[in-house]
Amino acid sequence: MPSKSSPKIHNAMWPGLVGKGDGPGQEPPISLEHMLELTAAASVNGQKFDGIDYFLFLPHTDPNASDEELNRIADLIASHSFSVGSLVAPVWPGTVGDSAMGDAAAKEKFLSAVRMACRIASIFDKHGIRKYGVIRIDSAEFGIEKWRQDKKANTQLIVNTFKEAAKIAKDHGQRLAAEGEICWAGMHSWKDMLDVLEGVGMPEVLGFQADLAHTYLYLMGYNAPEHALLQPGYTEAEFYAAYETMTDKLRPWTIDFHVAQNDGQVHGAGAHDKTGKHCPADDPNGKLDIVRCAGYWLKDAASRGIKHICWDGCMFPNATLETPATWNSILDTMIRVRDAHGW
């Protein structure tokens, strides 16, 4: 019998979408149905994934879908004995939303994406398929060049948009989590992310989503050398001292957690800007001891309302995503994280 039953173990559906498409050199998306089948097929010593997190956009989901269609999707997910956890709002330009530091029209698009996600979350909650999880957002401002032109003013624009988004979420009984990545302006370093979180100042509604791959590049100061906590050639002792410094700052805000691996590189595909490169769980070049690093983020997780953890491995080739061994290795890693740090 498994020694721990919480947090629940989820798989992300968006690796079937992110960086995929019909452009030159792109691979086609993998359908929600097939991603569910691949996830359901994974098994390690009789243990399975408990649920899924997913991105509320086409071709997986029309963010304007009718109640009837959304309930049909919930039934489809339930047919695999899965729960739904965290949902990704379509906040980016080219989906529904636009930059959180843009003009009034862009800001309204961003907020409309949050409203859509809250509506869908409420329908899933009412259906019974979703009993926990957050709605994931970020600044939706690709790159940091424009942000750098006036750091203080642009950070304030993001804070103001996030405050309005948090009020929308609160009215719907939902929580928002901003995912720190080096490619999103105002969220591209641990310090700038902390400035935004503290600027919003609504920890009960808007928190941080920590991803092991993306936060590794926070340590290295990839897009903010002035905030680097580590230099190349670091020792193991230096790594964990820096890791503790970063997690002590961001963990109190962390309400959603992505297990991931990174080899120290950045990667972009299709419409997705270069960001922390996700690697398979068993990648020999992985920089992270996944289980040990996860413990820094999952300390006191239950008290922050975390009820599940999710694997995130974006921009893998379809051949990797469609190989059963990929998901068994990931599930095995997730179980080891839960056995070490769960409850």
Where in the sequence are the language-model features?
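Acidic/histidine-rich catalytic cores of soluble enzymes
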Residues: 153, 159-277
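N-terminal pre-domain/capping segments
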Residues: 1-131, 153, 163, 170, ...
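A cross-domain feature marking catalytic cores of carbohydrate-active enzymes
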Residues: 9-13, 53-58, 86-91, 136-141, ...
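Active-site groove signature of glycoside hydrolases
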Residues: 121-149, 172-183, 310-311
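Aromatic-rich peripheral "rim/lid" segments of glycoside hydrolase catalytic domains that contact
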Residues: 273-275, 279-291, 297, 310-343
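A short, acidic, amphipathic alpha-helical segment used as a generic capping/interface helix at domain edges
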Residues: 37, 240-246, 284-304
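Acidic-and-aromatic substrate-binding clefts and catalytic sites of carbohydrate-active enzymes
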Residues: 17, 26-31, 54-69, 93-100, ...
